[in-house]
């Protein structure tokens, strides 16, 4: 078996494994009393992560440069990053929600890379002169890892909005689900709610929200905040590294290239998210909306700009 066949087998296994892991994660949420489902899904995800790592490593060995020079390699690295970040965060939080929201995205990315891209775009090609630099590994890998983390954090914010169904629930308690909160209904003024000894929340508009659901919302909100807080510094480092590399390659730190512009927009959105959470104590719906916008902007920055085929970052992608 040559390297190309081995790579194809690993990618096919990764897609099948992600599909299986997604179904197992969803089953663990639907049937929480069945023990072992979450561990089984995590094991499958770990095997997928290893398969993707083998694919990228073999391309690195065969071609002699870090495998982030075209769209196919970039997509596989993003899928690897999503599974790696997911496994790391899940090991720290023991949350079943992480895999349920991240694995479908990783599966879609892997499917797009292996099924949608033509064969000629999946093959490695010689590097253009500007990419023959050690900055390739540092800048691009850090940016891709930051995208993986920010995508995962934003997905949790989207999940928060789905669960609340448009209700403006401003959390006031701690991240473990204690304290009070405010519910703003569509046809009445905001009303104050508090928890009674039985654990059932009462409020003036007679809207009852189960305390377990509130614990879930507070956990999702806090986890999203922490994950985005982890990804933002990496995004900053990646942008700075790219500016230094651009100065070495083209003699300018910033050229307002489409990719650079959208990277800046991405940075500003998540900077605003963290600013509002830290200085204005935003919780709940408002920061979730901001993070959801950030989710879309990350994809525009990563994929959308490359479909234009313009700018300094268009080589090796969809030019």
Swiss-Prot record:
Position of the signal peptide:
none
Entries under InterPro entries matching the protein = Cyt_c_assembly, Cyt_c_biogenesis_CcsA, Cyt_c_biogenesis_CcsA/CcmC
Q: Which residues cross the membrane?
A: 11-31, 34-54, 71-91, 97-117, 142-162, 227-247, 254-274, 288-308
What are the protein's UniProt keywords?
Chloroplast, Cytochrome c-type biogenesis, Membrane, Plastid, Thylakoid, Transmembrane, Transmembrane helix
Q: How does it sit in the membrane?
A: Multi-pass membrane protein
Q: Name one GO biological process term.
A: cytochrome complex assembly
Q: Where in the cell is it found?
A: Plastid, Chloroplast thylakoid membrane
Q: Which GO terms describe its molecular function?
A: heme binding
What is a single Pfam family found in this protein's UniProt entry? Cytochrom_C_asm
Work out whether the entry's keyword set contains Cytoplasm.
no
A single GO CC term, please?
Answer: plasma membrane
**Where in the chain are disulfide-linked cysteines found?**
none
Q: Does the keyword RNA-binding apply?
A: no
According to its UniProt entry, the function of this protein is described as:
Required during biogenesis of c-type cytochromes (cytochrome c6 and cytochrome f) at the step of heme attachment.
Q: How does it assemble?
A: May interact with Ccs1.
Homology family: Belongs to the CcmF/CycK/Ccl1/NrfE/CcsA family.
Question: What name does the UniProt record give this protein?
Answer: Cytochrome c biogenesis protein CcsA
Q: Which organism is it from?
A: Porphyra purpurea
Taxonomic path: Eukaryota, Rhodophyta, Bangiophyceae, Bangiales, Bangiaceae
């Amino acid at each position: 078996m040559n390297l190309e066949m081995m790579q194809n087998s690993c990618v096919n296994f990764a897609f099948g494994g992600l599909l299986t892991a997604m179904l197992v994660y969803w089953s663990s949420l639907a049937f929480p009393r069945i023990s072992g489902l979450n561990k089984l899904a995590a094991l499958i995800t770990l095997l997928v992560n290893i398969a993707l790592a083998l694919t990228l490593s073999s391309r690195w060995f065969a071609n002699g440069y870090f495998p982030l020079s075209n769209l196919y390699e970039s997509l596989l690295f993003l899928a690897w990053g999503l599974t790696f970040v997911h496994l790391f965060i899940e090991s720290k939080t023991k949350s079943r929600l992480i895999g349920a929201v991240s694995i479908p995205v990783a599966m879609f990315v892997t499917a797009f890379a292996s099924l949608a891209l033509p064969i000629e775009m999946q093959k490695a090609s010689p590097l253009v002169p500007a990419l023959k630099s050690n900055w390739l590994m540092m800048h691009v890998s850090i940016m891709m890892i930051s995208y993986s983390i920010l995508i995962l954090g934003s997905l949790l914010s989207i999940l928060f909005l789905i669960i609340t169904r448009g209700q403006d629930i401003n959390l006031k308690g701690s991240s473990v689900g204690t304290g009070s909160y405010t519910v703003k209904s569509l046809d009445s003024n905001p009303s104050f709610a508090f928890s009674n000894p039985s654990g059932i929340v009462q409020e003036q508009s007679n809207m009852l929200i189960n305390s377990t659901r509130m614990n879930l919302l507070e956990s999702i909100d806090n986890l999203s905040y922490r994950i985005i807080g982890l990804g933002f510094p990496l995004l900053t480092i990646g942008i700075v590294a790219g500016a230094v590399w651009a100065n070495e390659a083209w003699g300018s730190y910033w050229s307002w290239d489409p990719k650079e512009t959208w990277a800046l927009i991405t940075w500003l959105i998540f900077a605003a998210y963290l600013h509002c959470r830290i200085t204005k104590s935003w919780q709940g719906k408002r920061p979730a909306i901001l993070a959801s916008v950030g989710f879309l902007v990350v994809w525009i920055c990563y994929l959308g700009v490359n479909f234009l085929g313009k700018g300094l970052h268009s080589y090796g992608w969809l030019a």
